[in-house]
Amino acid sequence: MKVLIIGKNIKNVYLSLDAKNFELDKNQNAHLDLVYDGGEKYYNDRFSIMTGQKLANEVISNFRIETETAFSPENPETCDDFQYILLSKNNYINLAPEFVKQCDFNSKILEKRTAKFDYLYIDWSAELNNVQIKTILDYLESHPKTKLAWCFDRSELPKLLSAPDLSKTNLTTFYRLLQRAEIVFVMGKKSQMMRVKQVLSTLSTLKLIYVTENQILAGVFKEDFRNKDIKVTRDVAATIIAGTTFSALITDWNLQRALMLAKINVENSKANKTLKINQLSDKLREALAIR
């Protein structure tokens, strides 16, 4: 089994803030002045990890699946988007910088004659443009046995929800690529789930896994989850859940067990370390003994 992971390397920079520096307004909402004077430090601790493609690669590799990555600089630490995450007690806020570095999609990896993959896995971080989508579609059309898994985050929901009839031909490249998907992960509100199901209903062989703030839903199965580590933010949790479920499904776990493994992984992982398959299997046996 060989998987090509397509996504960006994203650096999360966590700043732990001291609650005493916050000011409360008349409505008891907390505010913090983040104008730095060059000398005063507003945070107690600083910690950073790589997410996006790199985290997805770790999760999938932990299932002993062979992987390659499409955004492949020699040193991924030097080519990534990044965001600050402000931590205070049990809450966090994401701050995206105005200017970020952009990773280059290594399309040559799909042009090699030796490039044979069982699955292409598009992480939510990929943010593909039309040229990149066309490259992926061309590869799939010339490799009909290669399957596609695709993760959509909240920012991509409008495009997904406005999809035309996916049973038709002559669609744009984005929707033609969607037609090829065997597994789709969608991160969104539970209220939007039925509309997503309706849009994708014509893709009869598709497995849809829907992830909300605290639930994983697929078919008749549902798993509630809770992030025990505040550094496992929404985006990190989505990467762990999607990567775990995908890996379990393609290594012959059934859907119910795949969702249970995803719940276990997201609840027991640290932001910089996820569980290996033997650890997941042990914790799954413990969970089944309790249920």
Where are these regions (language model features)?
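Internal, well-ordered alpha/beta segment that forms a basic, Gly-enriched binding/recognition surface
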Residues: A248
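Ribokinase/PfkB-type carbohydrate-kinase core domain
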Residues: M1-D37, N44-V236, T251-R291
